[in-house]
């Protein structure tokens, strides 16, 4: 009886003599015992066959780019006003995409991923044109017309990257419609990582600000851009030369422009080397009395940098004072401190995609990493095909009738084959841009080498000194007058006392520029290799016991299996309500007697009366408390099965048992027909902002294109046979920058071609991209019946890839599958950083060491235009000297302190100026 105490049942009357009365009627069924221990795990099942590969997507065509036009000719001119600032050269053509890789043949455990395609050659970025010669006072020479766009030459094989070309002439970017966006192509065969592309060309250096008034060296420099005017002091020493940005070619000398908006003040530097004579600016207040000519002073010591003050509002210009005699030229002061790096220029047009590196070999499985923060939930993938039905297991032992407490959790079943990959979900909404970073102390780019120093003009005659007039009330600023002739330097006056330093400081932040148009969407990167399956994580704490579900329908009674070992007896439950007596079953055979239980306390023996007639059986007395259970006797032969009694009262649910070790996988059956697609899931929350990537090199900025109208969808074209890969084409000239077209409608899916025998992996030069089919994407066909799975054949040579089927409509997302084990993939190769957008091109910083590979970034948002620099000081009127030959480029300046600029975020990319 399984170790249960049946002493509470009515016992047959005991005979005084040792004569048995034979087997009595069957007793009532006792209460349900505790659940037995879990059985040993079953044997491991066989791996099921792999599912059929999905249909490949269709590749759209890439437009060919024409060759570059001939350079425009610069107009001749006498020395004089500067030429127009050159437009930044067009962006180099995008390299041809690599040949698509043939999808790997999926073996029993998922075949190896096909190797990636050879990378297209990276287009070269157009370099800025050389600086124009110094123009005359006459008009600017006309810019030559752009040459005609040549037709594209026949494609050639990719050559090794050539040497960095000379700075080419500047072309104009013209508008033009963009071609339709191609469909996503098959992943290409991965080639080796190409050499890094040439850095983007530096922008032209702006016109040089005029130098400060010459003074005796050694006194503190003039403050940077004007703050609130302090009391007028004697002329200070020359202010520190502004740091020159990363050198482009030397710009032509700019004419004195109108007064610019005040820029943010940089920290006051120590006196710089004396600059070339600048044009004289308006005097703030009347000049002090002229001192006697001073002796040539020695070099002054470096002053401490002044604290940054906020830029003051510019007051109206004061009346112009009389010119004092020019002093003797003092010795050069110490070199000023480097300025702070400037704001990042606006983002350029997207560059061509970088070369895809070769697929790495699978590394050893790493230790499981710390759980990352959950990313955004993507759209649910399409529902995978139903797994195979496992073989039926042996029938379990017949359960006791009645509703017992729930048993322990069963072992996890074998994991089914992975479902088909779901269609990619729509693009997430753009997150909010990150708030601007803390403002750094300065607003200039890293210093580059100084441009060539201009020649000094012949000295002019010194004007007579007039008496100091009374300080008039300050009138409003008049319009800037015409450029005066350059005066000859006069004799240096005696050093005046240094006026108090004005409170410099950063100016108000300029208004944010209009963000440029959205860059073109980068090519979709190749899918990384499947990472090795991670180990199981630590078991979580058991969850709370759920409310018991409704009782299921009673299943058919299984055949009795072999009895498992008896579990330890649980605590004695309270006896259930007594059920009604069922009909007596047929008498079973008496088993061998069990060990006798402990006898109850013997009652007192009554006096033996005369044996009377058998009287009426009295009512059964109350059940005595049960003695402890004796050890189980050996089991007797099984009696015939009695009918089940009525179900007992449902007990309380037991605590959840611990999950046993997972059993081996069962044999995977053939895949069932695919289920219906589920409904589209809700879009998940936006993921956390990723870490800041390192700033890419500044690209040449073109104007942003406008988004074109969405074109009508075409009818689906039939897939053509795959073309042979053509030789790598020569880089065509940059075409006219088109307006990006909108994405076409999806077409009907084509019939998937039969999977060919996989051929050997060819490494051909990438072919040219064919024209896109005009078709509309069709609806997905009904899945055919699933055939029986044949034995896995030997891996044959790889055949040519079949024609690409048309991409089907996005199916309804399937239900979310069970959570997989965490993968341990190798870190992906870094995606090519997008070029930066239009805006003033800042100087390129020195190239830092390569950081760790990050995930491919999305295109960043167009940066804000940089702040307008301060206007130069107006020079005195003098005659113009002849232009001298350009001097050699100066040495590069020391690197500036790292400034904090704005942070721009766009769709997960983060740029720091």
Curated annotation (Swiss-Prot):
One of its GO terms (cellular component) is extracellular matrix. Expressed in bones. Residues 1-913 are annotated as: Disordered. It holds the Pfam family Collagen. Residues 254-263, 281-303, 422-431, 499-517, 639-648, 696-705, 759-776 have a biased composition (Gly residues). Prolines at the third position of the tripeptide repeating unit (G-X-Y) are hydroxylated in some or all of the chains. The modification 4-hydroxyproline is found at residues 10, 13, 35, 41, 338, 341. It comes from the Eukaryota. Residues 28-67, 125-154, 199-220, 264-274, 316-332, 367-386, 408-421, 459-476, 488-498, 527-574, 581-601, 619-629, 650-659, 713-740, 748-758, 782-797 have a biased composition (Low complexity). One of its GO terms (molecular function) is extracellular matrix structural constituent conferring tensile strength. Residues 883-895 have a biased composition (Pro residues). Keywords: Extinct organism protein, Extracellular matrix, Hydroxylation, Secreted. Residues 602-611, 807-818 have a biased composition (Basic and acidic residues). It is found in: Secreted; Secreted, Extracellular space; Secreted, Extracellular space, Extracellular matrix. One of its GO terms (biological process) is extracellular matrix organization. The keyword Nucleotide-binding does not apply. Its main location: secreted. Type I collagen is a member of group I collagen (fibrillar forming collagen). Trimers of one alpha 2(I) and two alpha 1(I) chains. Interacts (via C-terminus) with TMEM131 (via PapD-L domain); the interaction is direct and is involved in assembly and TRAPPIII ER-to-Golgi transport complex-dependent secretion of collagen. Belongs to the fibrillar collagen family. These protein fragments were extracted from an ancient humerus epiphysis bone collected in Haiti. This is Collagen alpha-2(I) chain. It comes from Parocnus serus.
